[in-house]
Amino acid sequence: MLREITSYAELPLEETRTSETLSAFLSERGFRVKRGVAGMETAFRAEFSFGKGRPVVAFLCEMDALPGLGHACGHNIVGVASACAAAALAEFGKGVFRAGKVIALGTPDEETGFGKARMVEKG
């Protein structure tokens, strides 16, 4: 998955294939995925629930690349590592947790600094 996403090198708010790849990976592992959150087409929220209550653990899946430099900042690695960590925790938690959830947030537009801020503002 990392090689695939690295080959895309999509710019801020254009991370269509990257967002689809990460959210499909999570969906295939039992996460409920909502795409287009916070008014951004490529943002997503993936949630795996063990039941009502806590703990709640969240992972941030960064996705965008730099114009002319590709993934020089490593958001491809952050995105894949976060999605894999979320999936691993969900799998581990099936036999351990009776409550709580794992959330993976696809956070676009990291390079301009507005993606996460928009997601916070929109709840």
Task: Describe the function of each predicted region.
Residues 98, 103-123:
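Fold-level recognition of mixed alpha/beta catalytic cores in primary-metabolism enzymes, strongest
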Residues 1-103:
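Acidic/His- and Gly-rich active-site-bordering loop/insert found
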